[in-house]
């Protein structure tokens, strides 16, 4: 019997500046899932992260993202600069074609070993763009002259005009996002047969995936922050989101906005919750001409897990932290702890049949708050009897 070669798996890392910390969380999950690529392609920060992934420098990447700030990546004006000094700084940035990224270059110089990168078993490619004519350049390590890998990594991340173009052998290069922020085509050219793509929704051009290859797309439901604002707290949050989003993409957990246990007990609770929620909503509709308006319906529609959708939408609106792992029950407890109980109780007449027309109108005018009230009513009556308002996380 002929032995079949293993599927050539590729990890495709999009650009997105400071949002790149999200990709480190993805990497952590992929290692736990025992998913190992033979090919990695990246644009901009995706290329920088990808190089560290090729070198198996997870701890280095994690620690770097948890410590760097914007000032460690690019030259910035003094924090207490007066208006005159700020104007002078901005004039110089415009004159010099963007901010100086020497601090980032020093990090890349310290972290990345070109010889080790070339010797690694994972094939690696990046995208950059020649400034003249905006000519795209898709480059594998074999295409890059010896001693210039760091230069081309910096070129791929030269987010002009905010950052300076990178000059190599007399040619100026720009961020690869000017051509292809998600280099799936390059991955296929390098021999990929299966893709995992990590989208940061960064600026630039993201070409449609026309490879025809089996693809798992990983992107965050939540905002990941400004692309030029590097901050340890945001990085830590993004890593957790990336970790849980990857587990969800591979079917290990459920939910949409929140990481929810997919085990039997939690799933049974989710089924019971949704049935009870629908019953509460039906009861209110039968008493009053009040239903969820378009805004709240849209909020529910964004949630892909139908059973958990009302609970997740209410939890989001109440400000429940998305960086924790929950069961259906603990997510319910977190919502009850976070919601405005006085506001929730103000909707009680709608559920008891003693509401006025004004209260019904208020529910229609505040669809998200009314959705929270429906979830609150569901959880404090029959849905999950052991969950109480006093059990918040």
Model-found features: residue ranges?
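Patatin-like phospholipase
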Residues: 1-43, 51-393
């Amino acid at each position: 019997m002929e032995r079949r070669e293993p599927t050539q798996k590729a990890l495709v890392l999009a650009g997105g500046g400071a949002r790149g910390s999200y990709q480190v969380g993805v990497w952590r999950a992929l290692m736990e899932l025992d998913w190992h690529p033979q090919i990695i392609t990246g644009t901009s920060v995706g290329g920088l992260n990808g190089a560290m992934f090729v070198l198996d420098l997870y701890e280095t990447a994690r620690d770097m993202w948890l410590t760097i700030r914007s000032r460690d990546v690019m030259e910035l004006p003094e924090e207490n600069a007066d208006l005159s000094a700020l104007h002078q700084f901005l004039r110089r940035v415009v004159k010099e074609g963007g901010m100086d990224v020497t601090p980032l270059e020093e990090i890349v110089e310290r972290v990345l070993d070109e010889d080790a990168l070339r010797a690694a078993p994972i094939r690696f490619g990046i995208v950059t763009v020649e400034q003249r004519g905006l000519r795209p350049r898709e480059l594998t390590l074999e295409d890059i002259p010896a001693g210039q890998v760091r230069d081309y990594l910096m070129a791929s991340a030269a987010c002009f005009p905010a950052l300076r173009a990178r000059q190599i052998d007399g040619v100026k290069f720009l961020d690869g996002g000017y051509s292809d922020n998600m280099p799936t085509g390059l991955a296929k050219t390098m021999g990929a047969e299966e893709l995992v793509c990590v989208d940061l929704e960064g600026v630039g051009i993201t070409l449609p995936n026309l490879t025809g290859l089996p693809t798992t797309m990983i992107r965050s439901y939540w905002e990941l922050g400004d692309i030029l604002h590097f901050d340890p707290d945001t990085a830590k949050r993004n890593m957790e989101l990336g970790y849980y989003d990857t587990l969800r993409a591979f079917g290990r957990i459920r939910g949409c906005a929140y990481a929810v246990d997919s085990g039997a007990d939690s799933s049974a609770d989710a089924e019971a919750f949704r049935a009870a929620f629908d019953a509460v909503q039906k009861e209110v509709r039968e008493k009053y001409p009040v239903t969820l308006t378009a805004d709240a319906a849209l909020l529910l529609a964004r949630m892909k897990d139908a059973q958990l959708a009302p609970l997740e939408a209410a939890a989001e609106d109440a400000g429940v932290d998305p960086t924790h792992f929950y069961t259906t029950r603990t997510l319910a407890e977190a919502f009850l702890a976070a919601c405005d109980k006085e506001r929730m109780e103000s909707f009680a007449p709608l559920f008891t049949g003693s509401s006025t027309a004004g209260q019904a109108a208020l529910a229609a005018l505040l669809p998200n708050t009314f959705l929270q009230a429906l979830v609150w009513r569901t959880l404090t009556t029959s849905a999950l009897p052991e969950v109480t308002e006093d059990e918040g996380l």
